Amino acid sequence: MTTKLPKILVTGATGQVGGKTIDFLLKNKDIEIVAAVRSPKKAVPFTEKGIATVILDFNDDSTHLPAFEGIDRLFMVTGYTVHMLRQSKVLCDNAKKAGIKHVVHLGACGPDDATVGHWVWHQLVERYIEWCGFSFTHLRPQDFMQNLLSYGSEKSANDGVINAYVDDACMSWVDVDDVAQVAAVTLGDPEKHNGKTYRLSSDAKTFEEIAELMTTIVGKPFRYEPLSPEIFLQKMKDAGAEMAYMTCVYEHWIRHANGTIPGASDTFDNFFKITGKKPTKIVDFIEKHKAELDY
């Protein structure tokens, strides 16, 4: 008698965290993986690897139930606009109708009493997931180390100059690979990780300290030049970004710079407990990506 393998749907599959999560899930032979994409064109890289795909558009509710058919577990990764609130609610409602049992949600930084705008939005989504009655695991990563390589479409370090909007704040960091590894583990063993909220960060550094490490490891001079958060806000306006979300980001840069976000440099020892592996430190990340940082 053949046992039916649990089927996991990964949203955000073409993004950094979702894509890496699929890479880690491929090592688990006790599950089936389905990648959610918005168009047949975006499905091609997955089908070439033998990974099943479904069309799922958060803004097109009619795609939800067909995409959820036969799915047991959901990795929920929403976009970076205020529309994430409506998208998340409707997605959860339809996931419940489809019989999905476990939801792993990729949220944002902060403790339960966080007051940073977009962090709070993610926590409201967490509460709705719980209210719907799913078994759940909430992931709350701190700042991605990948932002040291690029932020949006811009390089973060140009000719050895690192720009950021947080003055001399010490921030906590996590590698996207580590977040994805935790996501894969929790999706693979929902019983063990049910009801858990995992804040994820393995290292805390200022940008000055990061510049010093880059200088040592890359072998060329790096320096940090802080920028005003006003520059970020204007860039977002000029780019035509959805400003409800980006205004929250702007305000959180100001709070980082002023040192008014409690626990902004907190780190956690849960990665090893969850995965059995050592987490990535900033020095490890720079070593791994020194060719990209070279100039």
Regions found by a protein language model. Give the residues of each.
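A hydrophobic C-terminal alpha-helical subdomain
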Residues: T2, I231-Y295
